[in-house]
Design a protein with these regions (language model features):
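Glycine-enriched, solvent-exposed interface loops adjoining structured elements
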Residues: 1-245
Length: 245
């Protein structure tokens, strides 16, 4: 759906649902509602409890097709810094647009001789296990206090400006590459160039990045949000909490 089609169909649906009683919306206002609708739909699709089908990303092949256009893969082989939470860890800067990590693994150089990092080494692939800080504390209370032989731990952190992952490997491992596949946050839907205002720090027109199969859902959701904003009553907002995705 083009930006013009989004705008035109928004007007039709909005006027129908409001019986032409509400004032018209300009392109900026429609862009705000469309972008909010897009973000809500993406988040609800990834949270099984947030949609009527009770299915997350891996629960339905259609979900993977729907979001294939904002799926990214990358590997990071440099720029590692020492861990701030765990002395064994290495901190990796990840892309700022990461919305949800799908899967990840690490490549490490492993010393073959236990306890001797200068011995002949081999390259090993480790499955990364994402953990939160509560889980980290629990694991550190155990006798071995380290990941299993073929695993590494990952903690997420943020210094206020950049998103970071702290990768914790075993005592004989040296991190060489971090591989990640993720869903990026879709860019804002901006129907036309903006003057005097911004949306997600952008002023130029931008199209919807999601698969066209989702465009009608985004449009319908945006109109519902606009209606609730105009009516402003509690019941409308409660109904919006009952996700239709």
């Amino acid at each position: 759906m083009t930006n013009q089609e989004f705008s035109n169909e928004f007007d039709v649906l909005y006027n129908n649902i409001m019986s032409n009683q509400a004032p018209g919306l300009d392109e900026y206002e429609k862009s705000v509602f469309l972008t909010k609708a897009q973000d809500e739909i993406v988040k609800n699709y990834f949270n099984p409890k947030g949609n009527k089908y009770q299915e997350g990303f891996d629960g339905n092949e259609k979900r993977q097709i729907d979001f294939s256009m904002i799926m990214r893969s990358t590997k990071i082989s440099s720029g590692f810094t020492d861990g701030v939470f765990d002395s064994r860890g290495k901190v990796v800067i990840i892309d700022s647009d990461v919305m949800m990590i799908l899967n990840e693994y690490a490549t490490v150089t492993r010393a073959k001789s236990e306890g001797d990092t200068n011995s002949t080494s081999e390259t090993v692939r480790l499955t990364i296990v994402p953990i939160n800080y509560t889980e980290y504390s629990r694991l550190m209370s155990k006798p071995y206090k380290r990941p299993l032989k073929w695993q590494a731990w990952r903690l997420l952190t943020n210094d206020g400006t950049t998103k970071k992952a702290e990768i914790i490997v075993g005592p004989n491992d040296t991190l060489t590459t971090y591989h990640i596949r993720y869903i990026k946050r879709p860019q804002a839907i901006i129907l036309s160039n903006l003057e005097g205002v911004t949306l997600d720090n952008k002023t130029t027109a931008q199209k919807c990045e999601l698969d066209p199969i989702l465009h009608q859902e985004i449009l319908q959701r945006a109109v519902e949000l606009a209606k609730a904003a105009y009516i402003g009553d509690l019941n409308s907002n409660i109904e919006l909490g009952k996700r239709s995705e």
